[in-house]
Amino acid sequence: MAEQSDKAVKYYTLEEIKKHNHSKSTWLILHHKVYDLTKFLEDHPGGEEVLREQAGGDATENFEDIGHSTDARELSKTFIIGELHPDDRSKIAKPVETLITTVDSNSSWWTNWVIPAISAVVVALMYRIYTAED
């Protein structure tokens, strides 16, 4: 069950949150905070199904990708019921940006320069051949 600290913050484990993935109990995680959006499902401008797809898990990346307004961010605070337990925070997948940065920093120079250069030369030659036939 949920643990409580001295500051009266309720901590929920990922296992607990995963159980709340249906229309009668819809919880999700945004920036390590746990939200109960059950009563907001019908009022969500993007539709109920958008929230239900994210229910029981971390919706931080999708929330940020949509570009919610300041009003939406303020409204979301009213649905906070606690925080993700500190032990479970490392279990949440890294954002895609982090993964892309890691892949880009490990790729070699030829994938960034040689392949595009060769592709450009091939396209230029094909264009020259095509225009020379006319």
UniProtKB/Swiss-Prot annotation:
Binding site for heme: 44, 68
Compartment annotation: Endoplasmic reticulum membrane; Microsome membrane
Organism this protein belongs to: Equus caballus
Membrane topology: Single-pass membrane protein
GO molecular function: heme binding; metal ion binding
PANTHER family to which the protein is assigned, alphabetical: CYTOCHROME B5
Residues carrying N6-acetyllysine: 7, 10, 19
Residues annotated as domain Cytochrome b5 heme-binding: 9-85
Pfam annotation, one family: Cyt-b5
Main localization, broad class: endoplasmic reticulum
Keyword Heme annotated: yes
Record keywords, A-Z: Acetylation, Electron transport, Endoplasmic reticulum, Heme, Iron, Membrane, Metal-binding, Microsome, Transmembrane, Transmembrane helix, Transport
The protein's name in its UniProt record: Cytochrome b5
Residue numbers bearing the N-acetylalanine modification: 2
Domain of life, per lineage: Eukaryota
Family indicated by similarity: Belongs to the cytochrome b5 family.
The protein's role, per its UniProt record: Cytochrome b5 is a membrane-bound hemoprotein functioning as an electron carrier for several membrane-bound oxygenases.
GO cellular component, one term: endoplasmic reticulum membrane
